[in-house]
Amino acid sequence: MTSTLPTRSFNTSRSRQIFARAQQLMPGGVSSPVRAFKSVGGDPVVFDRVAGAYAWDVDGNQYIDYIGSWGPAIVGHAHPEVIEALRRALEKGTSFGAPCVLENELAERVIEAVPSVEMVRFVNSGTEACMAALRLMRAYTGREKVIKFEGCYHGHADMFLVKAGSGVATLGLPDSPGVPKAATSATLTAPYNDLEAVKALFEQYPDSIAGVILEPVVGNAGFIPPQPGFLEGLRELTQKYGALLVFDEVMTGFRISYGGVQAKFGVIPDLTTLGKVIGGGLPVGAYGGRREIMEMVAPAGPMYQAGTLSGNPLAMTAGIHTLDILRRPGTYEYLERITEQLATGLLQIAQETGHEMCGGYLPGMFGFFFTAGPVRNYEEAKRSDLQKFARFHRGMLERGVYLAPSQFEAGFTSLAHTEADVERTLEAAREVLRTL
């Protein structure tokens, strides 16, 4: 492959100026920790605008974006159909605080697509969805203990900040100050892909476990897929012990297939949490599942949960039009093809340039680690060469490729990415890996 990358200066002076001021105004200068580039060094670039597969910073640098707003931008940033629909919705108002027909329309699409969902409740974030799902599994079973997996991230609620992934993993935090022991005393943990560890917990607490929650494909400790039989084994164990199985598909829902991991792998949980894609880039979350479970949620039932902006017309509009684009023929075949081209290309170039690297992909989602692997859980992910990743990230950034600024985050492709974008990315990767 002959490099055709243009020579470009990489001036980020305006970004540095803005970030310096931001640090005086906001903790760490950001509204979410991973954006601060703490694990890769240097100051973050400050975006000015996005469109399609690209982002531009305030200094005018253009990037091929493989973060996609951390997952929502699966049809590409600022898709014209979504933007036009939002313009029309804005003219009717930004929030009603009352029932809205758009809630019905998005709910019908979610229920049609996701096998486990017979009823759905909209909220405002993935964190909120997971908080409600946890409360619901406890309310339905009358039990308190919950099993989660090391490196899986379910938002920043107190009860989930135990061996969590995402920004917690990025910063190397074992948990978080300010979380009382009582909040996590009923949270049990096991290594991801370790069915025997889960069996042992059920044997120890056979009548006390309300359920198991997990990212069925991990994206918040890097990209880690389930081993054959793992999801099926969890389904069998939860049914055996009368516990609920909850798939956190905030990241994977409508991404690796229209029906998420559960549709692609054929393992159906009792409850599912969603977010990101279903809001088309606007703040949103949802949880849903079997009718008999969901009817416990107020006002139909006794389990209380509410939200001022839940089901707001802008998020519903963006979600409806995003899902309608995703339903078109060939969508996921294209995502699989473009993601395979990128992920396999990276591994091949790493091998050719003498670097240990392992990784994988599913449609629209990929990841890699600077280690020989295999990586089947968070402990194995931590074997990655983080200093090498940081240098690789910086080199790619300077060449116009925007990757997640953490080894412990998955990457995302979109319908807007082209084969030419991927080839350009691989050319940049070859240049950088030759220098490491």
UniProtKB/Swiss-Prot annotation:
KW Chloroplast (keyword) present: no
Statement: the UniProt record of this protein carries the keyword Endoplasmic reticulum: no
GO MF annotation terms: glutamate-1-semialdehyde 2,1-aminomutase activity; pyridoxal phosphate binding; transaminase activity
SUPFAM superfamilies assigned to the protein according to its UniProt record, in alphabetical order: PLP-dependent transferases
Primary location recorded for the protein, binned into one broad class: cytoplasm
Enzyme class name: isomerase
Protein name: Glutamate-1-semialdehyde 2,1-aminomutase
UniProt source species: Synechococcus sp. (strain JA-3-3Ab)
Lineage, broadest ranks: Bacteria, Bacillati, Cyanobacteriota, Cyanophyceae, Synechococcales
Gene that this polypeptide is encoded by: hemL
